[in-house]
Amino acid sequence: MRILVVFGSHRLGGTNAEIEKVMKAKSDKFDFDFVHLADHKIESCTSCHQCGKTGRCTLPISDNDRFQEIFDKMKTADAIFIISPVYAAIPSRLTALFERLTSVLYDSGVMNTDINPLLDKKAAIFSYCSCGICDDTPMKIIFDKFVMKNYRFDKSTYSYLNASKKPQDEYPNITAYVMSTLKQLC
C-alpha cells in the first residue's frame, strides 16, 4: 500500500523526523512517500480559474513551485497522511496547498462529478504543538472544505482513519497516535 505523508511544518527535523523514522521502520508493509513542505515552494492561488479549463493548475509561477507534483502524488497514493504542527494557525505552505487543491478540484468541475481523484482516499490528519497532540478537528474541517466534496465549515463529514475524539487523552505523543492509525491499514 502506497502512503503519501505530507509534513506541514516549516522546519525540518524535530517531531517530523521522529515520526518519519518510526514510519520507515514499517516500510516492509508500506511504501511511504514523504513530502516535507519545508523543502517545497507552494505559491498562493491567484484565482485565475485556468485550471477549470485544463484540470491542472496552470499558474504561471516559478519553476520551484511543487504544487502539481504533490497533487499528482496525492492522486496516485492509496492513503494520505497530513501531519502538521499548529503554531497559531495552519502553517502557510499547508494552507497554500489546500487553497490550490480547492481551485483545481472545484474550478475544473471535478467537485460536481464523481471523478474527484481524492474523494474516497483513505486519509488521516494529525495536529501537534509543543505541549503534545492537539485537537485535529479544526484541520479536518478545513481539509473537508478545501479538498473533499463538502464545503461546510461547521463539521467534518469525511471519514478519517483517525476518528478519535480526544487523541490527546488516548496517546502519550504524536508519534504513537500516527503509528496507531497506521496499524488500521494493515
Sequence positions of predicted segments:
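Short, solvent-exposed coil/turn elements at secondary-structure transition points
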Residues: 38-40, 129, 159-164
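Short beta-strand elements in bilobed, periplasmic/extracellular small-molecule ligand-binding domains
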Residues: 31-36, 150-161
